[in-house]
Amino acid sequence: MTSVAGARWGLVFWEQAGRTYAGVTGPETRTGTAPVPEGATFTGIEFAVGASLRSVPTPALVDGGIRLPDTTRRTFRLGGARWETPGPDDAEALVDGLVRAGTVVRDLLVAEVLRGHRPAVSRRTVERRFRAATGLTRGVVRQIERARAAAELLTAGDPAADVVTKLGYFDEPHLARALRSYVGRTVRQLREGGGGAIALDLGQRLTS
């Protein structure tokens, strides 16, 4: 499966051959190939840009991740506590619990900047906070999020010229380069569904 660059970290749970596993996935700065174990079933949760784990610095997760120990079908260990292993319908309850316990925290300044607000701090401070919260620069976060949005619009049938205008690309070659770097697909492949399986799920659960 083609993996897609992403500015968000996440939790992933999977079952394979009767065993249950859990891990933390980090932000990804480029497209690549992700192995998919045969017969495995997955549940994934992506966290909003600016959210982070108190016990694991996000920069340490970039282009990687960690396997969580002591995982069973019923529970897993994270941040010094045990949590119920979620199914697809239990993700929101798990996230609420992680936030209440302080296991997951969020930098509100990063969230405000992403919404277009101009904080009363220096650009250097904003950049430092972005790196601490996401492991990435503000510019890289913006480029990755824009490329993913472009891929979603193209998959939905929007013309490339409209995507260029809507998302602020210079021209169609600029859009094409971004898609190759961050999504691993051409405009035509996205519109026609070509290129094989891709880790770009329009219905994937996303937390704020």
Which positions does each model-derived feature cover?
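Pre-recognition alpha-helix immediately N-terminal to the DNA-recognition helix
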Residues: 146-149
